[in-house]
């Protein structure tokens, strides 16, 4: 099982809109593609949104991730929820 930590910087004034679109559009679509969201948090002081995503498949992470981004449903998200984001770094993490 592979886990990824994502730490997004959200554009000023757009956190509520981002959270709503993430919750209503991104999360259900990620789940449809075999991902599970393990947790999500807002850091008000830095205008950041942090979440942890997991995929249990035996495939390399890039395979289901590409399927997600290339899916008609993801391409059809209009407007694109990513418009709320300034930076989107992410890292693979493991349990200690």
Tell me the role of every PLM-derived stretch.
Residues 2-10:
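Short glycine-/aliphatic-rich beta-strand segments at the starts of folded cytosolic domains
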Residues 6-7, 42, 47-64:
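Accessory recognition modules or surfaces
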Residues 12-14:
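Short, acidic/polar linear motifs in exposed loop/turn regions
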Residues 17-38, 54-91:
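An amphipathic, aromatic/His-enriched active-site/gating alpha helix that lines ligand/cofactor pockets
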Residues 42-48, 84-96:
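Long, low-complexity, Ser/Thr/Gly/Pro-rich intrinsically disordered segments that act as flexible linkers
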């Amino acid at each position: 099982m592979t886990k990824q930590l994502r730490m997004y910087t959200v554009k000023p004034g757009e956190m509520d809109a981002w959270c709503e679109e993430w919750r209503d559009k991104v999360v259900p679509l990620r789940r449809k593609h075999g991902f599970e969201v393990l947790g999500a948090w807002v850091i008000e002081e830095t205008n950041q949104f942090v979440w942890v995503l997991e995929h249990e498949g035996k495939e390399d992470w890039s395979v289901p991730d590409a399927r997600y981004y290339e899916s008609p449903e993801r391409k059809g998200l209009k407007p694109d929820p990513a418009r709320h984001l300034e930076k989107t770094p992410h890292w693979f993490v493991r349990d200690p």
